[in-house]
Amino acid sequence: MKLNTIAPAEGSKKDRRRVGRGIGSGFGKTAGRGHKGQHARSGGYHKVGFEGGQMPLQRRIPKRGFRNTLGVRVVEVALSQLESAAIDGVVDLEGLLLRRIVRGSPDAVKVILTGEITQGLTVRGLRVSAGARAAIEKAGGKVED
């Protein structure tokens, strides 16, 4: 077998339909468009979503929700994830982003009481729930706002 002899399997490729190229082709003369009428003319048929005067689907279905421009996107981080995000005993947004615990650009990060913590860590610049704050301080750490 050589590269110049490789060919696709018989019947696996279908030729493009070349319309308007003679009566013998089966798609000559009117090129599969029939005789006269809106469909036969150039310049399009109807706009996308047009349903012949019936109320279109995108207008029949009610609107839902809104995008809150004043909303604050808070990402929750479990207490058990803090130890892996600590850099020199300090946990901050930079460390969480670096370790891929938090992705994107959240408006705020909140530490919640899920799991447990064994090391005394300093949590800096993050929101902390009351339960998580107590657990951090119990482990010998501190929370700096």
Swiss-Prot record:
Native species: Acidithiobacillus ferrooxidans (strain ATCC 23270 / DSM 14882 / CIP 104768 / NCIMB 8455) (Ferrobacillus ferrooxidans (strain ATCC 23270))
Encoding gene (name): rplO
GO cellular component: cytosolic large ribosomal subunit
Database matches in SUPFAM superfamilies: Ribosomal proteins L15p and L18e
GO molecular function: rRNA binding; structural constituent of ribosome
Function according to Swiss-Prot or TrEMBL: Binds to the 23S rRNA.
PROSITE patterns: RIBOSOMAL_L15
Protein name: Large ribosomal subunit protein uL15
Coiled-coil annotated residue ranges, if any: none
Gly residues biased stretches: 21-31
Segments for region (Disordered): 1-52
Pfam families: Ribosomal_L27A
Recorded superkingdom: Bacteria
Family per record: Belongs to the universal ribosomal protein uL15 family.
Keywords: Ribonucleoprotein, Ribosomal protein, RNA-binding, rRNA-binding
A GO biological process held by the record: translation
Subunit structure: Part of the 50S ribosomal subunit.
Keyword Transport part of the UniProt annotation: no
